C-alpha cells in the first residue's frame, strides 16, 4: 500500500541505503499514480478473480524476499493463510499500522498483530491502541524535496487546512474558528497532491485536524516547509516523543473548543509565526528525515532476521 506516499518514500530511502526494496500495490493511489514498483491492478470486482491475482503474486515473490513489510493491517493474501506460509518458508514479516487501521479498536480485534515478527506504529499517540508495539517509527520525508520560502508578513494571514476527510479532520470547527478571526482560509480537499502542496506552501498558518490525538503527514510536510502548525495533540504522546527523540514538539496543540484562542497569537505576531515555523523545520529534520527513518527500519529488520 502507498497511503499518503508512505510506502513509496520508504522503499526509495531503503534503496539509497543499499537495500533491495520494492513496493507492491493492489492499485496505484489516485493522486500518486506512478508511485509503485509492482502494480497488481486487481480486478475491481469478483473476489475469486482478485484472489487469483494475489496468490500468483505471492508465489512469484515469496522466493525473492527475505522480509515482507505490510501496511494498514493488510497482507498479500488473507492473513490466516499468508502468515503461516511465510513462517513455513522461513520469511520474516512486519506490519506497519498507519492510524485508521487501529484507531478505536480493541486489543482483541488487533490480536492478529502477534502473528507478525514485528509490528510498528507511527507515533506514541498510537500506542494507546497498540501498547506493545515493537517499535515507534514516525513517517519520513525526503527533505531534499522541501525547501521553505521566507515567510511573508501580511495584514490577513492565510490559514490552510487540507483534510483527507472533512468530518474526521474537524473541518467545520476550523471554518467556524477562522470566521471569528482576521484571516483568510483555504480548505484544500479532493485535489492532486501537487496542487495541494502548492496551495499549502502559500500558508502563513496550517491547521491539521481537531479530532485525533496526533498529527498526520500533512502537518509533517507543512513543518518541512517552515509553516507553524496547529493541531490536536495528546499531552502524554508529546512528552513521550520529546523524551524519545530529544527535541521539543513545536506544534501548537488545540482543540475544537480553544482553536480561536490558540490561533490568535500566531495571527497577531509575525515573529511568533517565523519562530514556530523554524522550530517545526528543525523538528522534522530530527524526527522525520527519511534517511533517519530508513536507518530505523534497517535496525528493526536486522533484529528479526
Per-segment meaning from a language model:
Residues 1, 58-78, 94, 209:
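Short N-terminal targeting/anchoring amphipathic segment
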Residues 94, 102, 113-148:
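Donor nucleotide-sugar binding/catalytic pocket of nucleotide-sugar-dependent glycosyltransferases
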Residues 5, 268-302:
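A charged, aromatic-enriched C-terminal amphipathic alpha-helix characteristic of glycosyltransferases
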Residues 204, 224-228:
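A short alpha->beta transition loop at the rim of the catalytic pocket in nucleotide-sugar-dependent
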Residues 228-237:
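Short hydrophobic beta-strand element within catalytic cores of glycosyltransferases
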Residues 148-169, 175-178:
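Conserved donor-binding/catalytic core segment of Leloir-type glycosyltransferases
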Residues 67-72, 83-103, 118-121:
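Active-site proximal beta-strand in glycosyltransferases
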Amino acid at each position: 500500500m502507498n497511503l499518503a506516499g508512505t510506502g513509496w518514500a520508504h522503499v526509495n530511502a531503503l534503496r539509497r541505503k543499499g537495500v533491495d526494496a520494492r513496493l507492491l500495490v493492489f492499485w496505484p493511489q489516485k493522486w500518486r499514480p506512478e508511485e509503485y514498483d509492482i502494480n497488481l491492478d486487481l480486478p475491481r470486482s469478483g473476489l475469486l478473480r482478485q484472489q487469483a491475482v494475489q496468490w500468483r503474486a505471492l508465489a512469484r515473490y515469496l522466493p525473492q524476499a527475505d522480509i515482507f513489510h505490510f501496511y494498514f493491517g493488510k497482507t498479500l493474501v488473507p492473513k490466516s493463510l499468508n502468515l503461516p506460509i511465510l513462517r513455513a518458508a522461513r520469511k520474516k514479516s512486519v506490519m506497519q499500522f498507519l492510524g485508521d487501521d487501529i484507531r478505536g479498536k480493541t486489543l482483541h480485534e488487533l490480536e492478529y498483530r502477534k502473528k507478525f515478527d514485528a509490528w510498528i506504529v507511527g507515533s506514541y499517540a498510537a500506542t494507546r491502541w497498540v501498547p506493545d508495539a515493537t517499535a515507534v517509527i514516525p513517517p519520513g520525508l525526503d527533505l531534499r524535496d522541501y525547501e521553505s520560502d521566507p515567510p511573508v508578513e501580511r495584514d490577513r494571514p492565510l490559514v490552510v487546512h487540507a483534510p483527507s476527510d472533512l468530518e474526521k479532520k474537524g473541518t467545520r470547527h476550523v471554518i467556524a474558528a477562522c470566521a471569528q478571526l482576521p484571516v483568510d482560509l483555504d480548505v484544500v480537499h479532493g485535489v492532486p497532491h501537487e496542487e495541494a502542496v502548492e496551495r499549502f506552501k502559500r500558508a502563513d498558518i496550517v491547521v491539521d485536524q481537531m479530532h485525533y490525538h496526533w498529527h498526520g503527514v500533512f502537518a509533517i510536510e507543512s513543518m518541512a516547509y517552515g509553516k507553524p502548525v496547529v493541531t490536536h495533540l495528546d499531552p502524554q504522546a508529546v512528552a513521550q516523543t520529546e523524551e524519545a527523540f530529544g527535541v521539543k514538539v513545536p506544534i501548537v496543540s488545540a482543540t475544537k473548543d480553544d482553536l480561536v484562542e490558540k490561533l490568535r497569537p500566531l495571527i497577531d505576531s509575525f515573529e511568533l509565526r517565523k519562530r514556530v515555523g523554524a522550530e517545526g523545520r528543525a523538528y522534522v529534520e530530527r524526527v522525520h528525515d527519511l534517511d533517519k527513518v530508513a536507518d530505523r527500519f534497517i535496525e528493526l529488520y536486522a533484529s528479526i532476521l
